[in-house]
Amino acid sequence: MYPQLPKSYKNAYPFRISAPSFIYPDDYIPNVQMLGPYLDEIELLCFESHESSLPSQETIRELESLAKEFKFTYNVHLPTDIDPGSPERKEKNRFVETLLRVMDLTLPLAPTTHTLHLPCNQAPIGRICDKAWQGRISESIRRLMDAGVKGPSLSVETLNYPLEWVEPILREYDLRVCLDMGHLIANHEKIETTYHRFAGQTTMIHLHGVNNGKDHLALDAFDQSWLDKIFSILKRFTGTVSIEVFSYNHLLASLAVLEKNMR
């Protein structure tokens, strides 16, 4: 039997509190059964695009039933093993086909958003955007829009490059933003500046600790000066905050930090 969270965090904050669907070392349904009674939202992780790694239609039906039973919502993290900026046409086709398939599969769950990675694989990563890469990203997103995807349903996550690199694409297709605080801090970005610039487009914040280059740790990995900066943003935010850690102990410690700093 897995340990339960000590109390409910539903409607506790100005934002919706979320956690990933792999907190416990088990499949989707056991995780959602354990987390659903305590949280506003669950981040359904679909990191891998292979059919065997995705939830089945039967699992989706059960996940839909659990959301109704425990009164929570889902957000979906789209696959990360596909590359919309690839120079290879085959890879860009796979990106479009995969996202359409996963979004169709999870449609019954009425996700609040779909979190999307737009990886930049140029090396070394500098401060100058590769315009050819930017153009390929734009083409891939346009193909999604042509297939019927609505721009506001996608939240582009901050990764290992400045979000400004894709800002023209965000504007052109009316995309939303997922601010991953851990990634911003690890990449030495100014979180307050980035938040102010993209606050109107930000629907999702990913929250996890960072220490010595390692991320997705519990929030107690941060010293108080970092926590003060993070929570000055969270206290003004009304979207979804997903504590993006992958173990019960890290989630429990993070929820304690959250509760202490939101007083």
Task: State what each model feature region is.
Residues 61-81, 135-147, 227-233:
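Alpha-helix-loop-beta-strand connector modules within alpha/beta enzyme cores
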Residues 2-13, 30-32, 85, 166-176, ...:
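Histidine-acidic metal/acid-base catalytic patches
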Residues 1-78, 82-101, 263:
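N-terminal pre-domain/capping segments
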Residues 15-21, 40-44, 74-78, 114-116, ...:
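Hydrophobic faces of well-ordered beta-strands that scaffold small-molecule active sites
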Residues 12-14, 37-41, 69-73, 106-113, ...:
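A general structural motif
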Residues 6, 85-177:
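Active-site acidic/histidine proton-transfer and metal-coordination neighborhood
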